[in-house]
Amino acid sequence: MKKNYNPKDIEEHLYNFWEKNGFFKPNNNLNKPAFCIMMPPPNITGNLHMGHAFQQTIMDILIRYNRMQGKNTLWQVGTDHAGIATQILIERQIFSEERKTKKDYSRNDFIKKIWKWKKKSNFSVKKQMKRLGNSVDWDREKFTLDPDISNSVKEAFIILYKNNLIYQKKRLVHWDSKLETVISDLEVEHRLIKSKKWFIRYPIIKNIKNINIEYLLVATTRPETLLGDTALAINPKDDKYNHLIGQSVICPIVNRIIPIIADHYADMNKDTGCVKITPGHDFNDYEVGQRHKLPMINIFTFNGKIKSNFSIYDYQGSKSNFYDSSIPTEFQNLDILSARKKIIYEIEKLGLLEKIEECNFFTPYSERSGVIIQPMLTNQWYLKTSHLSQSAIDVVREKKIKFIPNQYKSMYLSWMNNIEDWCISRQLWWGHQIPVWYDDKKNIYVGHSEKKIREEYNISDDMILNQDNDVLDTWFSSGLWTFSTLGWPEKTEFLKIFHSTDVLVSGFDIIFFWIARMIMLTMYLVKDSYGNPQIPFKDVYITGLIRDEEGKKMSKSKGNVIDPIDMIDGISLNELIEKRTSNLLQPHLSQKIRYHTIKQFPNGISATGTDALRFTFSALASNTRDIQWDMNRLKGYRNFCNKLWNASRFVLKNTKDHDYFNFSVNDNMLLINKWILIKFNNTVKSYRNSLDSYRFDIAANILYDFIWNVFCDWYLEFVKSVIKSGSYQDIYFTKNVLIHVLELLLRLSHPIMPFITEAIWQRVKIIKHIKDRTIMLQSFPEYNDQLFDKSTLSNINWIKKIIIFIRNTRSKMNISSTKLLSLFLKNINSEKKKVIQENKFILKNIASLEKISILSKQDDEPCLSLKEIIDGVDILVPVLKAIDKEIELKRLNKEIEKIKSKMLISEKKMSNQDFLSYAPKNIIDKEIKKLKSLNEIYLTLSQQLESLHDAFCKKNKIFN
């Protein structure tokens, strides 16, 4: 092994070794227990970010852990076409490079550009995954637009359609006028903005005599939608207005006569108590319109301008001539804000604008394009999720699918109990084109292809069929991911072996987008051999969101994004600044980002290697919703990897010529060897329990504690003493245990730190005569419930306490570690005497002792000894001969004066009534603790000084 640990020397070489030899591949052995994880397919829109790296590390830990338990493992890898996100990206790209828009290309030519991007992006993402150590079967890599996946998507659509679960309907949707597509409710961001509220008069048509008011006053924040009003609503309990129910008003500008209706949606205590109803452009109004069977008017074009003619529909969405469809010429083709100004101008001219008020209200914005969302009446395809939800609710309630942490179960159930039908169509070019064809009479035909439809329905070639232009929502194909990747609808061996999968690792932000829909679609479409619905996965492990060191969300615009590969390989400051400030959507932020980057990383980012990054992810994987990234912990775990490397070098150096033999734990072995085997066994138990319960943070801490604090800090120090002073038999057997424990420890650590453990294991296996080719196919250490001895643990713990006491004595009395001391023990029982006798040479070596003596109860204690009672035994370390009395007296007096000075300041503060009355409680508590600590130090120093003054011993005292 090289002297210095350099991840670059081992990582790429080892990954190629694993991949080339097919160690990641599953097999078709039905008799072997299977374990399968479906990787949530990252989008092809760019490189992997911290969230991807974090979740993929967790998944790889689980895959490697289960593979080492002898399971037939499949980690299915793939990427998502990400319809809307990818199309936006390519549209921006061609505008930036060519000053062209999507509409300057044919659909096929535009899609060719995306496929070209996909090839480049996929290569980059794949390279990143390999750098992270992902043990995926690359031969089974999938893309959501692969032909076999597309076939699965079509088959799913056809089955759902033929079972009346997919339907087409004109309904109100969230419309993105920039992208000209419907977007999901979950892609709408509500922002609080400053705006105005306009109070508009609607003249009343007086059909009866007892109407004594001229108009109804309505408050609106969207006066442009007045063009689409089809009613005014008042609350039936409102005494001011209920006599007007059934009457009519004139809608200003368009002079449309609309009814006054009674509906509880109108809030008597809000604004005027009367509301305008625009079913074609407001979701609440749409519901009111459905209750009262009101006509619906569409006033906007798909790109957000006023139409040339109104589109008028009845409440069921059928074309209607209920109202005049003409729009005044001066409003036609105006954008929304211009139309708003024009409407207000005209209403004011008509004397129908009563007042304007400033207000703040929430406005829906598209998370995709950033424009204000317009509720729009459009014809879309829907999936009846309300018909699929109950079984998906039941499996979670019955714990057939478990959410970890459990709090996300409530979130899931809450949403599922209020689920609405899912709009599955999108007005995009990139994606799965809906497998629906229309003839010239608008008859609908659903099938895999035009050819198959003609065959199935006996349609001649003379009849023209046109395929629906829309594509399916990306989440529809993603919802089939657990089984489409395994060959469904064909009954493949892989589907039989690996479905249902074992665990889904995902974020809380896509529980509704993806997880819920996967459960519903899988349970409806996939059945076991008995015809029972299959679940997509047994467990759902929800990770927290990785935030920066200040707790802020990582984003390009904030300039706080860190590429995981930059932490693995390192990056210079200039390269990091360039990376963070290039291609910003808001270039004016570049100076701020530059300043922040220089402040945070004045020397760039140092290379840490993959294992340190993976260990950091594991250590931070708590059950919290937000996870704050910590560069200092990353550096600390880089040092941890270095510690393991150096410890392994020591072991290999001292065992290179050792002839290893198998052994069992017995009472004849040295206490330290029995102790390390028991400690390791206990570590295995708690470590496995942590991984089995998805507590990766606890598992990482357990591993860290054993490697650093138990194996390196104590066991290796014990071993050095044995090698230096032990008998031939003790040395030989200790080397055997040493290499054995290291090999087991490497196996235990492998799932979290695959590269460094493989690199070291390849050398360890030679000494242990292991013929296998890789650590990743070794058996994972198992807990042995027979291997436990409380006395061994307590005896070594006692020895450790003695050593720590001696080291503290040296520190207190300023005694060099090269100066030999003596150790006296008093009030010691026979068991402890035996422990001392058998481990005397270890104690002497580690604690730098000249001699160890046992005193009887009658013996006087050595003068000027530091004493501590440890586990009932008096431990005494004489220091008279080890110190220079005059120098030590001077040092102690100086220290005492310093402490007295600090105590005086603290006491003065604590006697100040103003401080006690006005200082915050935490500051006062801190001062109390400080004074207590100073008193304790003063007492200790005073006792040491007194002991020094009493340095001349009485006649019967034992001298050092």
Curated annotation (Swiss-Prot):
Look up the EC number in the record and give it. 6.1.1.9
Q: Which Pfam families match?
A: Anticodon_1, tRNA-synt_1, Val_tRNA-synt_C
Q: Name one GO cellular component term.
A: cytosol
Please state what class of enzyme this protein is: ligase
Q: Which UniProt keywords apply?
A: Aminoacyl-tRNA synthetase, ATP-binding, Coiled coil, Cytoplasm, Ligase, Nucleotide-binding, Protein biosynthesis
| Reaction(s) this enzyme catalyzes, per UniProt | tRNA(Val) + L-valine + ATP = L-valyl-tRNA(Val) + AMP + diphosphate
Residue ranges annotated as motif 'KMSKS' region: 553-557
What residues bind ATP, as annotated?
556
- Lineage, top-rank taxon, reads Bacteria
Q: Fetch the HAMAP family from UniProt.
A: Val_tRNA_synth_type1 (MF_02004)
Which family would the database say this protein is a member of? Belongs to the class-I aminoacyl-tRNA synthetase family. ValS type 1 subfamily.
| Protein name as catalogued | Valine--tRNA ligase
Native species: Buchnera aphidicola subsp. Schizaphis graminum (strain Sg)
Q: What would be the name of the gene that encodes this protein?
A: valS
